[in-house]
């Protein structure tokens, strides 16, 4: 099979290799997927650059992908053969991810991709869409609640806006990119606030118009912790799926305790198969109804993996970067 791999950390154009490798064979409990698309996420490019040590002598990057099940290992339902699926956790604690023609992985890490939904879209779902669904729905239904979603110009947060709105919540969103405000409104937000201007707490209160804000979803949890605590109503929840700019914030425990607040973190790779399947079903249902837009910014051929990594590293994307493996 054709694949992209690296054997040391470093710049994409220096360490990524495009070439031939042996086709994988599904072990017991696994499926073999003929991949048509591979999604490039920030965690993939950070791992390649050296954010953590090499876990294996050779790594095929990327955890997200989409394709067709070609074979199954022992103990797996043979009726899965021929199914269109999207893939998660392709390179989580495993050497060989989705930047290849084939991947063999645990059957619990593939989810049905609805007919009519392209493989490129499927490859954009695993990490971003399941993170967003978990952030919105981990604690149960949100219909009638008012939710604050930070950084809604970003991929995960924009998906969270769509999921929360579709589930019946009122959504207030923030962005540091005012030019994307109309797009965030179109995704389902009732109000969009430029978090760089004015008093954020007051702006959220004005947008909420007396409604209690019960949930804050944030990719920079530590940076915004103080304002999130102030914004939230009693028994509210802060859901953090990142905290790069302030990784070790001071935690005002007593303030949180006297509001009975919950601080919840998400690492999508650690979702159990049943929980992930439940979120995947919600995402698939929204896709079928045309209620979810998993935006694609760029599709490149597999051999251009280095360019794809560079695009993700550059930041300021308005959608996913995908490698075509068809």
Task: State where each predicted segment sits.
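C-terminal hydrophobic helical "lid"/dimerization subdomain
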Residues: 1, 274-326
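Glycine-rich beta-strand-centered segment in the early N-terminal region that forms part
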Residues: 22-40, 49-91
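NAD(P)H dinucleotide-binding glycine-rich loop of Rossmann-like/cofactor-binding domains
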Residues: 78, 88-151
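Short glycine-centered segments of the SAM/dcSAM-binding site in methyltransferase folds
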Residues: 84, 146, 170, 236-237, ...
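Short, glycine/polar-rich helix-capping loops at beta-to-alpha or helix-loop-helix junctions
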Residues: 98-99, 175-183, 248-253
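Mid-domain Rossmann-like dinucleotide-binding core that forms the NAD(H)/NADP(H) cofactor-binding site
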Residues: 123-197
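Short amphipathic alpha-helix with an adjacent loop that forms part of the alpha/beta core around
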Residues: 200-210
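Glycine-rich phosphate-binding loop and adjacent beta-alpha segment
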Residues: 223-292, 324-326
């Amino acid at each position: 099979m054709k694949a992209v791999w690296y054997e040391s950390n470093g710049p994409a154009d220096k360490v990524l290799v495009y070439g031939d490798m042996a086709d994988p064979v599904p072990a017991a409990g696994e499926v073999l997927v003929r991949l048509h698309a591979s999604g490039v996420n920030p965690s993939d490019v950070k791992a390649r650059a050296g954010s953590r040590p090499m876990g294996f002598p050779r790594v095929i990057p990327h955890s997200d992908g989409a394709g067709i099940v070609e074979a199954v290992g022992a103990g797996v339902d043979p009726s899965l053969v021929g199914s269109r699926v999207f893939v998660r956790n392709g390179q989580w604690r495993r050497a060989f991810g989705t930047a290849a023609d084939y991947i063999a992985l645990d059957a619990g890490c593939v989810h049905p991709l609805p007919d009519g939904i392209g493989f490129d879209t499927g490859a954009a779902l695993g990490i971003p869409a399941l993170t967003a669904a978990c952030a919105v729905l981990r604690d149960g239904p949100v219909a009638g609640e008012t939710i604050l979603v930070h950084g809604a110009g970003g991929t995960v947060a924009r998906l969270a806006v769509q999921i929360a709105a579709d589930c019946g919540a009122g959504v207030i969103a923030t962005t540091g990119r005012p030019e994307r405000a109309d797009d965030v409104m179109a995704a389902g937000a009732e109000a969009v606030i430029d978090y760089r201007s004015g008093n954020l707490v007051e702006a959220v209160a004005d947008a909420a118009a007396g409604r209690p804000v019960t949930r804050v979803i944030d990719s920079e949890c530590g940076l915004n912790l103080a304002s999130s605590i102030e914004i939230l109503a009693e028994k509210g929840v802060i859901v953090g799926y990142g905290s790069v700019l302030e990784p070790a914030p001071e935690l005002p425990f007593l303030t949180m305790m006297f509001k009975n607040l919950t601080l919840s973190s998400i690492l999508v790779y650690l979702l159990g198969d049943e929980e992930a399947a439940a979120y995947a079903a919600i995402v698939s249902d929204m896709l079928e109804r045309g209620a979810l837009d998993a935006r694609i910014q760029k599709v490149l051929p597999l051999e251009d993996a280095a360019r794809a990594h560079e695009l993700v590293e550059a930041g300021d994307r308005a959608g996913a970067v995908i490698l075509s493996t068809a």
